Amino acid sequence: MIIYPSIDKLLEKVPSRYSLAVLAAKRAHELESGDLKMLSDYKSDKSVGKALEEIAAGDVIIDPKSKMLERDAEKLDRKDQE
């Protein structure tokens, strides 16, 4: 169960719970792979908790350009399958 940061604070930074879950998972994977940490101090010891703390701090956001690229790639995949 998430105590810190609160889900309400996180949803101020991300438009939906689904987007929050995906963003946190991707960032946690980056942290586990050795990516640089964006905060100097974390309350959580786990990578998902650290990712959520970075999201709450506003240091990790959803890149609108990457969302557009993903949509374009999905459209191309659909056309290729037809």
UniProtKB/Swiss-Prot annotation:
The keyword RNA-binding does not apply. Keywords: DNA-directed RNA polymerase, Nucleotidyltransferase, Transcription, Transferase. Disulfide bonds: none annotated. One of its GO terms (molecular function) is DNA binding. SUPFAM superfamilies: RPB6/omega subunit-like. GO terms for biological process: DNA-templated transcription. Belongs to the RNA polymerase subunit omega family. The RNAP catalytic core consists of 2 alpha, 1 beta, 1 beta' and 1 omega subunit. When a sigma factor is associated with the core the holoenzyme is formed, which can initiate transcription. Promotes RNA polymerase assembly. Latches the N- and C-terminal regions of the beta' subunit thereby facilitating its interaction with the beta and alpha subunits. This is DNA-directed RNA polymerase subunit omega.
